[in-house]
UniProtKB/Swiss-Prot annotation:
Its cofactor is Mg(2+). It comes from Pyrococcus furiosus (strain ATCC 43587 / DSM 3638 / JCM 8422 / Vc1). One of its GO terms (molecular function) is 2-amino-4-hydroxy-6-hydroxymethyldihydropteridine diphosphokinase activity. This is 6-hydroxymethyl-7,8-dihydropterin pyrophosphokinase. Catalyzes the transfer of diphosphate from ATP to 6-hydroxymethyl-7,8-dihydropterin (6-HMD), leading to 6-hydroxymethyl-7,8-dihydropterin diphosphate (6-HMDP). To a lesser extent, can also use CTP, UTP, and GTP as the nucleotide triphosphate substrate.
Length: 231
């Protein structure tokens, strides 16, 4: 998804969610500055080299654990969306890529970063967490405003749908969604403070609505075939 295609979605999201475009821009610039100073960033062509034709994107929905118990996932690149990283590690699976706005369990993100490329997303609400990226060996920066030179915007809003847009941008031919659920139940892996699956709160419902709409857009407009993992 190009910026011109993403912009109308973004403007709707900002209006409905009450976000600040200026704060989002500040966050993108801050992430860029940190990555440039620390020199631990990669460019998209480097990430492209590790993405296989088949990509599994792991969301943190309530059906994730059952999928991890029965799936193999060795025939494709494994991209974990933030909180799903903790579930994968618990089941002995190391993701190849983690897409995160640093909202998951930090210790698990740090563990995963030893082997995974960390795709870190900057927005107005996580500027205080962005200095953490200096702890990650390899980082690809993303944002939700206009892209900068080393901070990209491939489209997508939540960690899960952004991961799918990332896979599309990297040339995947097939994207398998694992642990995605739009029924209104939030999986316990979604937030570090959750102890069990729980009904979605108002802002989360809005995010799920946008995520579903964006994935439908990707199915209809992207090159990759997008399917849901079946147990």
């Amino acid at each position: 998804m190009k910026w011109e295609e993403w912009k109308p979605f973004y403007e709707r999201i900002v209006k409905e969610m009450g976000y600040s475009i200026e704060e989002d821009r500040r966050a993108a610039e801050l992430l860029r500055d940190i990555l440039m100073e620390n020199d631990n960033y990669i460019i998209k062509e480097e990430l492209n080299s590790i993405i296989m034709q088949k990509v599994y994107v792991f969301g943190a929905g309530p059906n994730l654990e059952e999928a991890l118990k029965k799936g193999d996932f060795k025939d494709g690149t494994k991209i974990a969306a933030d909180g799903a990283t903790s579930a994968l590690l618990e089941y002995g699976i190391t993701p190849d890529v983690v897409v995160t706005d640093l909202d998951g369990r930090i210790r698990d993100l740090l563990e995963a970063s030893r082997k995974a490329v960390m795709v870190v997303h900057a927005h107005g609400d996580n500027m205080d967490k962005l200095p953490l990226v200096v702890e990650f060996p390899l980082v690809l920066g993303t944002c939700q405003t206009e892209p900068l030179d080393i901070v990209y915007n491939f489209g997508g809003f939540t960690d899960g749908d952004r991961a799918a847009f990332l896979a599309e941008e990297m040339g995947a031919k097939e994207i398998v969604l694992v642990g995605f659920d739009f029924s209104g139940i939030v999986g316990k892996w979604s937030k570090p403070w959750l102890r069990d699956h729980t009904p979605a709160w108002e802002s989360k419902m809005k995010k799920l609505k946008f995520a579903r709409e964006l994935l439908e857009w990707l199915k209809n407009n992207g090159r990759a075939k997008i399917i849901e993992f079946s147990i």
